[in-house]
């Protein structure tokens, strides 16, 4: 559905050119919810604005629905953009227009008749849960409701792609969850391809199928969300996952562990389970099979896209050969095993 091929974006700066994007290539499938995450200044917003050519890339190609947007003239590009809706952190509603009229605005600009507008807007307001508020003004509704208006307005032209640029970052956690649930519903019911730009790994965890991690304008990691959580490869990814799932041992645990390491019999590991592995007694089986003692130091169970995800930090006590064999056994059972060589 969306192909980004070798995108680079350079801007003039006070001390030379600023490289906002560096050779970014991504493939996003039709009907997919794809997340793009990174820290501030990583190039996320520049990238999402390149998808609909609000920012024309310095080099590279943007292909949406088989059409190379970078090759279009201005008139053809305006038509192509009708297939791409966009929502923002700031709602950008017109204060003098009602909820209904804000959603209707792009249809009015497209020259639709009053009956055509009504036939489109009313079902959209029902979809986003705002039918009873259609005659209210932006000053009379909440932030979450304003974002729902923004979503309905973005859907008014019946796009095939919805771009979300930090759309929940100004909302409280409860409202954020409700907006993410709405986006999942829209994806499910309309088959819409959604690209989520965010700095919050919690958003990625809740709604996305796949994710790309940006750092300094480059894609440093990409994959299914569950796989990225299980096996983060880049330090930026590990740090951002740590914001939602504790990766470090608590200080009180570190003090107890430190005194026992180095004796040759105690080894600390981080174990990650997913799916059916969360429900299986694999630790008990390893203890019985290899005659070891396992001390659980820290644990966490969560859910990613409806799939159970568990993380444990354990201290395994026993002969080194037996400990290694037990870890290999756990890996054979689908457990991701990482030895924590330095805990302090």
Curated annotation (Swiss-Prot):
Topological relation to the membrane, as annotated: Peripheral membrane protein
Compartmental location: Cell inner membrane
E.C. number: 7.4.2.11
Domain (ABC transporter): residue spans on this chain: 2-241
Pfam families: ABC_tran, NIL
Cellular compartments per GO CC: plasma membrane
Alphabetic keyword roster: Amino-acid transport, ATP-binding, Cell inner membrane, Cell membrane, Membrane, Nucleotide-binding, Translocase, Transport
InterPro entries: AAA+_ATPase, ABC_transporter-like_ATP-bd, ABC_transporter-like_CS, ACT-like_dom_sf, MetN_ABC, MetN_ABC_transporter-like, NIL_domain, P-loop_NTPase
Reactions this protein catalyses: L-methionine(out) + ATP + H2O = L-methionine(in) + ADP + phosphate + H(+); D-methionine(out) + ATP + H2O = D-methionine(in) + ADP + phosphate + H(+)
Binding site for ATP: 38-45
Enzyme class at the top of the EC tree: translocase
A GO term for molecular function: ATP binding
Family: Belongs to the ABC transporter superfamily. Methionine importer (TC 3.A.1.24) family.
Function of the molecule: Part of the ABC transporter complex MetNIQ involved in methionine import. Responsible for energy coupling to the transport system.
Oligomeric form and interacting partners: The complex is composed of two ATP-binding proteins (MetN), two transmembrane proteins (MetI) and a solute-binding protein (MetQ).
Protein name: Methionine import ATP-binding protein MetN
Organism, scientific name: Cupriavidus pinatubonensis (strain JMP 134 / LMG 1197)
């Amino acid at each position: 559905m969306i192909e980004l091929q070798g995108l680079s974006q350079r801007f003039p700066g006070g001390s030379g050119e600023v490289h906002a994007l560096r050779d970014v290539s991504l493939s996003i499938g039709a009907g997919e919810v794809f997340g793009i995450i990174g820290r501030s200044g990583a190039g996320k917003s520049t990238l999402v604005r390149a998808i609909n050519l609000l920012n024309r890339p310095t080099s590279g190609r943007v292909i949406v629905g088989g059409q190379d947007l970078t090759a279009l003239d201005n008139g053809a590009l305006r038509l192509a953009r009708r297939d791409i809706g966009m929502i923002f952190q700031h709602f950008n509603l017109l204060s003098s227009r009602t909820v209904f009229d804000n959603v209707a605005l792009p249809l009015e600009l497209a020259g639709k008749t009053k009956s055509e507008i009504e036939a489109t807007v009313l079902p959209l307001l029902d979809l986003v849960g705002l039918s009873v508020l259609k005659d209210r003004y932006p000053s009379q509704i909440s932030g979450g409701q304003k974002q729902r208006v923004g979503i309905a307005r973005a859907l008014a032209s019946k796009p095939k792609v919805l771009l979300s640029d930090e759309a929940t970052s100004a909302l409280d956690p409860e409202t954020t969850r409700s907006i993410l649930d709405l986006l999942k519903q829209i994806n499910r019911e309309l088959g819409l391809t959604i690209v989520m730009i965010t700095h919050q790994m919690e958003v990625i965890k809740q709604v996305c199928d796949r994710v790309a991690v940006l750092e300094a304008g480059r894609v440093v990691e990409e994959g299914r969300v569950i796989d990225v959580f299980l096996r983060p490869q880049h330090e930026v990814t590990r740090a951002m996952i740590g914001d939602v799932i504790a990766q470090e041992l608590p200080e009180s645990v570190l003090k107890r562990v430190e005194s026992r390491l180095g004796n040759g019999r105690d080894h600390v590991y981080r174990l990650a389970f997913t799916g059916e592995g969360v429900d299986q007694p694999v630790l008990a089986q390893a203890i019985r099979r290899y005659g070891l003692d396992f001390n659980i130091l820290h644990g966490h169970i969560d859910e990613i896209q409806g799939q159970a995800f568990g993380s444990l930090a354990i201290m395994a006590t026993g002969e080194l050969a037996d400990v290694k064999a037990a870890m290999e056994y756990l890996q054979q059972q689908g457990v991701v095993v990482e030895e924590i060589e330095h805990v302090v």
